[in-house]
Amino acid sequence: NKQFKIQINASTIDEAYLKELIEKGADLENMEVGHNYYPRKDTGISYTLLKERNSIFEKYGFSIMAFVSSLNERRGPIYEGLPTLESTREIRPLLSAQYLLNAGVDIVIIGDAFASDKEINDMTTIKKDIWTIPLKAENITKEEMDVLSGVHTNRMDPGEFTIRSQEARLKKTSTIKKRNTGERLKYFLTIDNEGYLRYERELQIVMKNLPSDDRINIIGDLSESSLLINQIKPGDKFEFLID
């Protein structure tokens, strides 16, 4: 029946089984591929398995679907979310959707029926080839906000312990005054203040605990987005969604 497509479970089928279906006359044009969702905690599949399965179906030209959880109102009777990946069960859809897309998923569905308006609106900000990282706007100065704005590119030669914006220091802003300095923990976002002279406006995401430096302002904690930040490679683009 060409009006309805058959969907096969991407989480449980390997290439040998897919080849068997093809040998028996399966019409790939009439098939779709979707990963399972897992209501019980600790049963979602791994990122490694997801990418492994996706690489199979990509070879055959399939679009791939997978699920993320809502943190708003979860489906009963278990109420533990409906994700494909276990690692995204307790993560907001904005982040888990990008994690899936980076692994080769084409279509992301919120498994729980009652996602909040904010969760849905946040997902509409996702852009192809740009990581969207949420940031709580707590006591950020106008000058710092000017540095944060727009799209940033991780330098092709980032530091061993930092993600570095190649655009930030070129921004035309007023002086960045010293404030909120202290120990720089992993996943902290920082901007260099006027004390760092020509490095003023340098924007970094810290990838290892580093000591306090009075020349470096701490802007916020991005640890909520650690799954995404760990995927940022040299040359990757990213921007901040101010919560």
Language model feature labels by segment:
Residues 1:
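N-terminal active-site wall of soluble small-molecule enzyme domains
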Residues 138-243:
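C-terminal functional modules
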Residues 11-147:
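Catalytic alpha/beta core domains of metabolic enzymes, predominantly
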